[in-house]
Every structure is written in structure tokens, then in C-alpha cells.
């Protein structure tokens, strides 16, 4: 992986999140996990380059993100679609998903990411907020919450950008 600056990124994040999906990768004192995400955002907040990811409050990954200062967001080529599908449908509660997926753990400044990613954002968590159901303004959004499982938004400062060789 090669490090580049945020301004050198040439990637369509709309497709990256929504069409191609991505992984949020996190490690706490006990274990690590990778979870497929299809909702996210990139932008500037508080004069920092940030990425926002959304995790349902019932997901095993949530407590790990709550307890971690850093995480990574990894984007992959289409050939990894089956692995992302697996990582999005299985729970770390039951198995070591990264090992079972045969993806390779690597580190950048003690932050875990996956070697096979074509683009990795190393994130320092700077804010998190639960999204309350009673604040939904567009009622069409409620179809995503029929079982009441809301999301937590995790906003991270992009501290490093890595691209595949």
C-alpha cells in the first residue's frame, strides 16, 4: 500500500459506499472485526477531513467502535464482493470473520486494515451520536427502521489514506 494525501484521492465514494460497499475494520483490547457497510459519507467537518459510517445499535461491531479510538474504512474491487457479502451476513459473536474470509490483517501505526483493499482510510474517531427515531423528518426513511433498530453515526478524522499497489 502506498500513502497519499486526502487531496490526491481519485475515487467515487457514492459508488464506493452504495454500490460496491466497504468494510469498517476495528480492533479493541480483545478482538478484531470487519463489518460490511453500504451507508457512509465523506466531507469536511470542524475543518477536518472526515468520514462518517453508520452502524446499527444491534450489531456486534458497535461496542468495538464505542471502545476504540481508531478504525479503518476499506474499499475493494468487485472480485472481493463475495467476501464482503460474507462479512456483512455473519456475526463476530460466532466466529473470527476476518480469518474465515481469508483476508489479510495488516497495520498502519497500530490501526488494523485489510491488505486486499484498493483504498483504505485510517480514521481517528472524533464524534459519535445515536440517531433518534423521533428526529426523522422524511417519513420514507422509516422503512429502514420497521424493527426499531436505529444507527449510531461514527465520525472519524481521516489521518491517513492508503491505496493498493
Question: What are the functions of these language-model segments?
Answer:
Residues 1-37, 41-165:
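Active-site-proximal mixed secondary-structure blocks
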